[in-house]
């Protein structure tokens, strides 16, 4: 997995829930001072995260070790290495993939996948950054956690990469020639992954900005790998990289949570670190010398041959902001990013939008590299607007310095960031993982300063005190206006660039093949065959058995509890979830959409996108956003869908318009007041603002389709037969995009009618008799809720309205959507219940088996795709999908082979147990207070009973091989639906266009 800065994209195991620290004893910190093999360098009380921290160094090997102990049982271990790339061959990235493909003590071909299949991990992955490579694991089970640590330490220090070159050729790159007279090509998992990454214009922009700002240090090179350069990497260079950087002296070892730290340190020393002597590793990240003047560079990205170049250019303004070792500056620019750029109506965003420069103004502050970068980006602009773009930005910045930044915006930014810090809810990721990654923002560059960013309470206090003092204005002057270490980067479209480069590559490979002797060509064929044979060889049983596996008996049969208490407050139905939340109330106000017609659904999607970022009767939209973030932890809207699992054959579902907020109990009154303001007082006749939002929405939808093409394609294919999937597609998918694009392109004719329709929808939807509330809090958080709910209900529409039943018609289309990408997202879907096959808990095991065995081996390992997934749910929907896949027809053939694979499914009892444990691992993720409430409400709305969950769990824990073989009929039913949607390269889709009923471009 490749990552730029702090943005992490997970393709494999990604549905992980974080664990939240509540109250507990942090005084039982380990007595590591008695361990003579380590030197204690720092010992700190980390009050901000309620933990104790110790910085150590292993005396013999020079390994840096950081311990963070609290009572969080979601334990985290990671080992990281500083890995500055010297070129763009992607060797750090290829190494990250390769070391997880077998090691001295765990010689199986893919221990990583074996762990995914058979451990209770709450996180398991690895990430390549521009200057480091990180290998983190997490688990709540002590035995499992130790197993994960063992496999990962062995992988990074004793990988099998030295035994043969097949892992390098599989994960990195290799020549592929199936027969002597065939076409020569490149293949490799990383090679294909980066072809996908380089197909996105946002990806191109991120990379060229980094390379432009730092021409003289490691950031000038592409650590993930440039597909044009990856094939220059030799096997010996690959091995040299490991010899150089993968040594304990260049490592950063991190342990977090509730565990016996002394025991872990002894184990690390005795099993691994004591076998190494200290070594000088030249991996220092050098500072880039500042420029004498701002640089200007222009690059190209590819669009489809029939796509317009008009309003398709990216303009970016980028400045380097000190270093990440400046504690206050590191956080201060997060606040400035909010106040100047990211918040709706922020001055930079508003000025550029008003000037007509770009349809979507974005920005970022990347403090995940040594020298952070502040960026302003105008998407869907014209290259000719570059000079005006720079002028508008700098005029706004000068005005902010002269007249002062909006103090409420600064306070809102500080409160927003501090609330997130104190809440410590990282959604799908363990808290300890995210702390560990943030620690690396300073520790990597100064081995004596690991804690400066996770111990942030003093920093927030400092930043609050600086509001109104001129501090922030001085930062703008120094780091943005007077700073010459910057770059104006233009990324402009080129029609058919992908096809042109592919033709050049094919010509180059053909000429290379022609230059070879017959013997050399035959060797390429033999090497291709040898790699395929290696990939197809069954694992040696003895090697697999070296990977530790828990027993079924280690798994509890108990299910996680529900927290649903029905009540009425102010005559409004409330489902209350009594959970300790550290004084935060999580409110979700839900409005039924069953009275909205199918023809109105796109407008509902637009309404959801508009509310909260448009003026209201009492606030300009920028003031509204600041008012919310000064007083609460945030308010947002969404459209949700709940399938009734007791009426599957009737395809019954309930859709809702939801507005969610979170705040300290003392601020809940304000939260409800702001919700009422958004729902009842928004100025939906502000057509100028609606036009801006539609342009932004169109841009963001395209970005989503490009970055998450697998989910988009799966949803679209499901929508051919599923009313609930069709609903989602009409409100957030491809169908919705088409409607948004049409209205945006014909806005002058559409605007008045659209405004009227949006107002009418607010009257139809936002009614007290159409409302229910989900509320998560401790019992004391119920106090005062009734009058708050009554006040909200009182402001809603009480007039009678005409409701129209939502009748959705589905139609099978089998579409291919052409893009300028070099890879495909191939989705095949169907409903097995429609074909007479019932749901069983064993289908959750099937998802693990297919995603990490049959599909993994055939689509990723042999096919070179980056990812592959499958899913089967309670309402009968099943899908197979690939991610960043160089193939199309071949992948569909792999899907067709699932039935035969399952009919002949035979594994050992040990492997069967492993699949079951991996399945339970996905189900038993630790939950934050917020996610406990959300899970309870989702089960309530979907009519899923505790008995259903218990039955499903028992079916999983008691499953045998014959239960998996019986699922062949499920796969057969899904494939029989013959529902196909592919998003991918125009050449590949045109090549296989006979597969589709319709081929079109976005």
Which residues does each predicted region cover?
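Non-catalytic, conformational "gating/processing" segments within enzyme and secreted inhibitor domains
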Residues: 187, 239-271, 754-789
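Active-site recognition of the HExxH zinc-binding catalytic motif
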Residues: 89-101, 608-609
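Long, compositionally biased intrinsically disordered regions
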Residues: 461, 474-561, 702, 711, ...
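Hydrophobic, small-residue-rich alpha-helical packing segments that form membrane-like cores
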Residues: 180-181, 185-195, 203-238, 242-248, ...
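Non-catalytic terminal extensions that flank enzyme cores
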Residues: 24-78, 292
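Short, positively charged and aromatic/hydrophobic N-terminal segments
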Residues: 2-22, 26-28
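His/Glu-based metal-binding/catalytic segments typifying zinc-dependent metallopeptidases
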Residues: 69-71, 78-80, 191, 195-199, ...
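M16 family metallopeptidases and their MPP-like homologs
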Residues: 74-84, 110-158, 165-176, 203-228, ...
């Amino acid at each position: 997995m490749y990552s730029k800065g702090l943005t992490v994209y997970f393709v494999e195991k990604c549905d992980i829930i974080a664990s939240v620290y509540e109250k507990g004893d942090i005084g039982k910190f380990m007595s590591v001072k008695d361990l003579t093999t380590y030197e204690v360098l720092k010992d700190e009380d980390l009050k901000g995260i309620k933990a104790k921290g110790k910085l150590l160094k292993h005396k013999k090997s020079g390994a840096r070790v950081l311990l963070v102990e609290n009572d969080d049982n979601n334990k985290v271990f990671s080992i990281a290495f500083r890995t500055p790339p010297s070129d763009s061959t992607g060797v750090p990235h290829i190494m990250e993939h390769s070391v997880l493909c077998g090691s001295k003590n765990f010689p199986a071909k893919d221990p990583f996948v074996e762990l995914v299949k058979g451990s209770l991990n709450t996180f398991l992955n690895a990430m390549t950054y521009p200057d480091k490579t990180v290998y983190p694991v997490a688990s709540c089970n002590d035995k499992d956690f130790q197993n994960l640590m063992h496999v990962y330490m062995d992988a990074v220090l004793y990988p099998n990469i030295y035994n043969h070159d097949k892992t390098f050729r599989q994960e990195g790159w290799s020549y592929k020639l199936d027969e002597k007279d065939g076409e020569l090509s490149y293949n490799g998992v990383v090679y294909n992954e980066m072809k996908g990454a380089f197909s996105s214009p946002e990806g191109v922009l991120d990379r060229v900005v980094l390379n432009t700002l730092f021409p003289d240090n490691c950031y000038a090179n592409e650590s993930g790998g440039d597909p044009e350069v990856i094939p220059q990497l030799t096997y010996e260079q690959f091995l040299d990289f490991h010899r150089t950087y993968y040594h304990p002296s260049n490592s950063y070892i991190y342990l977090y949570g509730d565990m016996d730290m002394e025991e872990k340190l002894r184990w690390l020393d005795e099993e691994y670190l004591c076998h190494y002597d200290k070594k000088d590793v030249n991996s220092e990240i050098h500072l880039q010398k500042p420029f004498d003047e701002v640089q200007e560079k222009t690059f190209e990205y590819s669009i489809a041959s029939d796509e317009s170049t008009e309003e398709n250019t990216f303009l970016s303004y980028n400045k380097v902001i000190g270093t990440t070792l400046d504690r206050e500056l590191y956080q201060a620019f997060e606040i400035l990013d909010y106040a100047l750029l990211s918040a709706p109506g922020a001055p930079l965003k508003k000025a550029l939008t008003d000037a007509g420069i770009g349809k979507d103004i974005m920005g970022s502050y990347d403090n995940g590299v040594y020298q952070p970068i502040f960026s302003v980006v105008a998407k869907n602009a014209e290259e000719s607007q570059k000079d005006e773009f720079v002028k508008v930005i700098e005029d706004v910045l000068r005005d902010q310095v002269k007249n002062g930044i909006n103090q409420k915006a600064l306070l809102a930014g500080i409160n927003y960031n501090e609330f997130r810090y104190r809440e410590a809810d990282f959604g799908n990721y363990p808290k300890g993982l995210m702390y560990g990654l943030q620690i690396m923002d300073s520790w990597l560059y100064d081995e004596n300063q690991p804690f400066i960013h996770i111990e942030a309470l003093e920093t927030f206090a400092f930043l609050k005190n600086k509001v109104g003092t001129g501090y922030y204005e001085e930062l703008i002057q120094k780091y943005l206006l007077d700073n010459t270490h910057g770059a104006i980067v233009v990324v402009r479209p080129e029609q058919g660039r992908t096809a042109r480069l592919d033709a050049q590559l094919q010509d180059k490979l053909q000429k290379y093949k022609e230059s070879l002797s017959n013997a050399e060509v035959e060797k390429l064929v033999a090497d291709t065959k040898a790699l395929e044979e290696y990939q197809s060889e069954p694992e040696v049983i003895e090697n697999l058995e070296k990977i530790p596996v828990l027993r079924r008996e280690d798994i509890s049969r108990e299910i996680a509890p529900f927290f649903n208490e029905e009540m009425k407050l102010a005559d409004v139905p409330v489902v209350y979830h009594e959970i300790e939340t550290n004084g935060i109330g999580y409110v979700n106000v839900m409005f039924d959409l069953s009275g909205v017609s199918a023809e109105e659904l796109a407008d509902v999607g637009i309404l959801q996108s508009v509310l909260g970022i448009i003026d209201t009767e009492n606030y300009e939209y920028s003031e509204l956003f600041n008012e919310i973030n000064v007083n609460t932890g945030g308010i947002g809207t969404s459209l949700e869908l709940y399938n009734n699992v007791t009426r599957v054959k009737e395809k019954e579902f309930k859709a809702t318009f939801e507005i969610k907020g979170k705040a300290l109990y003392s601020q809940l009154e304000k939260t409800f007041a702001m919700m009422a303001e958004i729902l009842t007082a928004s100025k939906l006749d502000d057509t100028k603002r609606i036009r801006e939002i539609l342009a932004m929405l169109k841009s963001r939808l395209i970005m989503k389709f490009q970055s998450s093409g697998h989910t988009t394609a799966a949803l679209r294919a499901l929508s051919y037969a599923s009313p609930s999937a069709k609903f989602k597609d009409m409100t957030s998918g491809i169908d919705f995009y088409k409607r948004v694009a049409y209205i945006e392109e014909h806005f002058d004719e559409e605007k008045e009618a659209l405004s009227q329709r949006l107002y009418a929808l607010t009257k139809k939807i936002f009614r007290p008799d159409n409302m229910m509330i989900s509320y998560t809090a401790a019992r004391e958080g119920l106090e005062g809720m009734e009058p708050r709910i009554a006040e909200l209900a009182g402001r809603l529409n009480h007039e009678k309205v005409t409701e129209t039943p939502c009748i959705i018609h589905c139609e099978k289309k089998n579409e291919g959507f052409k893009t300028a990408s070099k890879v495909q997202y191939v989705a095949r879907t169907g409903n097995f219940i429609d074909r007479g096959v019932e749901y069983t808990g064993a289908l959750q095991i099937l998802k693990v088996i297919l995603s990490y065995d049959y599909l993994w081996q055939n689509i990723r390992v042999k096919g070179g795709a980056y990812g592959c997934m499958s899913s089967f749910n309670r309402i009968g929907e099943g899908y197979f999908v690939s991610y960043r896949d160089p193939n199309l027809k071949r992948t569909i053939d792999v899907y067709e082979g699932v039935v035969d694979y399952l009919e002949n499914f035979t594994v050992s009892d040990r492997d069967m147990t492993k699949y079951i444990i991996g399945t339970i691992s996905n189900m038993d993720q630790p939950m934050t207070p917020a996610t406990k409430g959300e899970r309870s409400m989702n089960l309530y709305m979907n009519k899923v009973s505790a008995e259903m969950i218990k039955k499903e769990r028992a079916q999983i824990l008691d499953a045998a091989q014959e239960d998996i073989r019986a699922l062949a009929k499920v796969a057969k039913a899904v494939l029989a639906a013959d529902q196909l949607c592919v998003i991918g390269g125009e050449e590949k889709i045109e090549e296989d266009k006979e597969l589709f009923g319709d081929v079109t471009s976005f």
